[in-house]
Amino acid sequence: MAVSHGFNLTEATTSVSAPVQVSSGLQIIVGTAPVNQLANPAAAVNTPLYVSTYKEAVAAVGWSSDFAKYTLCEAISANFQVVGTAPIVVINVLDPANKKHITALDETSVQVNDGVAEIDKVGILLEKLVVKKDTTALTADVDYIASFNDDGTVSLALITGGAGDGATTLTVSGSILDASKVTADDIVGGVNAATGAETGLEVVRQAYPKLSKAPGILLAPRFSKNAQVCAALQAKCRKINGLFNAVCFVDLDCSADGAQKYTDVAEQKTKQTATSREAYALWLYVKVGETVYSGSSMAAAATVYNDSQNGDRPVASPSNVTIPISAACLEDGTE
């Protein structure tokens, strides 16, 4: 038998530690996610998705580290990567079937290097992607294989023997699922009078009948700085399904249009309508390293973790509880 002498090095991908499973204070989070990365994006739109691990969450709604654009990813990171709590329920409102959420990917040329071309755009809908070699349209999985990179951009790998084989440039066009097009109205949502379909915060009602889970904390990270969203969150906390009461965590606007000094917070809280007993108003964002998180995402996760330290009972205030952050900051990252 061979005997190894000296030092040996083995490298493994860093994994996310298992989160603490908490039965109280279930977070229901409404926001945006890069669902264009999924095989069936429509299945992750305006429906409550229950996730217990980081892996489940990414499989359910996709992943991006651009938290300003994809707010559900921020909440996923705050819970599973930073604080270490689970489960959560996520409701994505970014909808590939909504023309208002679509931006055209105008025809553009991309260079092919060693049989691979890179499309430097995020949000691309693969089913709408048109790829050409000169004037010849290429067929997905026959002439090329499209895949998402870690940053959400797309790689096109040409298949040997396919119609694109040997190309030095390709022409691409299609559609982009654009998170910047989501508005406060999308988050607040509503009910379609003809079909009864619910969107946005109206979907909160579905958590109990679909998942058998009672809501505890409602939040819409970053979007809740809007007074309309803030008011809707508070209204949704009362008598959910005619039975359950919840609280909501809302972000006070700390952009140039909001409160950038603590002396302006009281006025901003009133301006934003964050005045009910259900509303926990959070001023300032936070940093973990150089990554910026909204106050609502981090505080909600920390509150649930605090419950876990008290037998899953929401009996202790999360006030003055230590959380793993590097700094407090404004929305733009200014400390």
Predicted feature locations:
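A glycine- and small-residue-enriched flexible loop/hinge signal that marks low-structured segments
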Residues: 2-21, 26-45, 49-52, 62, ...
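Glycine-rich, low-complexity segments
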Residues: 177-186
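Extended beta-strand solenoid/passenger and fiber regions
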Residues: 85-150, 176-178
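A surface-exposed beta-strand-loop module
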Residues: 142-143, 147-167
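Exposed beta-strand and adjacent loop surfaces of beta-rich binding modules
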Residues: 46, 126-130, 167
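Short, hydrophobic/aromatic-enriched beta-strand segments in well-ordered soluble domains
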Residues: 168-176
